[in-house]
Swiss-Prot record:
Enzyme class, UniProt record, top EC level: hydrolase
Protein's recorded name: 3'-phosphoadenosine 5'-phosphate phosphatase
Annotated Mg(2+) 1 binding sites: 73, 91, 93
GO function term, MF aspect, one: fructose 1,6-bisphosphate 1-phosphatase activity
UniProt: substrate binding residues: 73, 93-96, 216
Cofactor: Mg(2+)
Organism: Mycobacterium leprae (strain TN)
The protein's role, per its UniProt record: Phosphatase with a broad specificity. Its primary physiological function is to dephosphorylate 3'-phosphoadenosine 5'-phosphate (PAP) and 3'-phosphoadenosine 5'-phosphosulfate (PAPS). Thus, plays a role in mycobacterial sulfur metabolism, since it can serve as a key regulator of the sulfate assimilation pathway by controlling the pools of PAP and PAPS in the cell. To a lesser extent, is also able to hydrolyze inositol 1-phosphate (I-1-P), fructose 1,6-bisphosphate (FBP) (to fructose 6-phosphate (F-6-P)) and AMP in vitro, but this might not be significant in vivo.
InterPro entries in alphabetical order: CysQ/Inositol_MonoPase, Inositol_monoP_metal-BS, Inositol_monophosphatase-like
Length: 271
């Protein structure tokens, strides 16, 4: 397996460029792991992917941003992050189930940088300052917050809203939304793949209820917001990161033009 732990670290990389570089490197490593281990033992494949990608990212961040804190799905939660001014929120492998299944491409790598705001004002746009989401099995495509643009949409608000949901755990609120809006659920694997489908214009929204962790949505939200789209809690309040408890109960990411409509319906039916 080739080494992805760079020796010639580039201190001049911007935070956004570093996020993209890290996502790319982790994606390349995960593709190699998939090739070498194969799919006969999915649990072993997933465990190796989680562990080795996490090790790579932590090593790179220690070398290139030694003063920053890290919150990772695959590492101990060091509460020093709560006093830190800069925290990298990472998911080395988003969608372990999909990664471990032959032919699936809807898994991702998430890299986000949270920075403390001043004056007590905080929202998703200001807190997640730099982000990258890689889809390694789709040509290792990387969506980065400093270059992303939303996919072209035409014809105004669609008659039927395409909403990305979990294939295994679709949110129950969809039934109530359907009583008010014409919707088409679209099953997609990982959180990152769902959110980037919104960015690409393949779906109109990504709705999640039932809880995730900060690393599941930080980088996707950073990219979605940078693309000029909407990301918030279901009640419309800002997404908050680097919290004492990194559990995030719900969120919606969607086209900016449908956000008022979708949030309005959610307010009507959500209890």
């Amino acid at each position: 397996m080739a080494s992805h732990d760079k020796r010639d670290y580039q201190a001049e990389l911007t935070d956004a460029a570093l996020a993209a570089d890290l996502a790319t490197a982790a994606g390349e490593l995960l593709l190699e792991i998939r090739e070498e281990i194969g799919f006969d033992q999915p649990r072993a494949l997933g465990d190796a992917g989680d562990r080795l990608a996490n090790s790579l990212l932590l090593s790179r961040l220690r070398a290139e941003r030694p003063g920053d804190a890290v919150l990772s799905e695959e590492a101990h939660d060091d509460r020093v992050r709560l006093q830190a001014g800069r925290v990298w929120i990472i998911d080395p492998l988003d969608g372990t189930r999909e990664f471990s299944t032959a032919g699936r491409t809807d898994w991702a790598v998430h890299i986000a940088l949270w920075q403390r705001t001043t004056g007590g004002v905080a929202d998703g746009r200001r807190e997640i300052t730099d982000a990258a989401v890689a889809l390694p099995a789709r040509g290792n495509r990387v969506y980065r917050s400093d270059t992303v643009t939303a996919g072209a949409v035409t014809g105004g608000v669609p008659n039927i809203l395409r909403i990305a949901v979990s294939a295994t755990r679709p949110p129950t609120i969809l039934h109530r939304i359907r009583q008010k809006l014409a919707i088409e659920p679209v099953a997609i694997g990982s959180a990152g793949a769902k959110a980037m489908a919104v960015v690409d214009g393949d779906v109109d929204a990504y709705l999640h209820v039932g809880g995730q962790w900060e690393w599941d949505s930080a980088a996707p939200a950073g990219v979605v917001l940078a693309a000029g789209m909407h990301a918030s809690r279901l009640d419309g309040s800002p997404l908050r990161y680097n919290q004492l408890d990194p559990y995030l109960p719900d969120f919606v990411m969607c086209r900016a033009d449908i956000a008022p409509i979708l949030l309005g319906v959610i307010r009507e039916v959500w209890q």
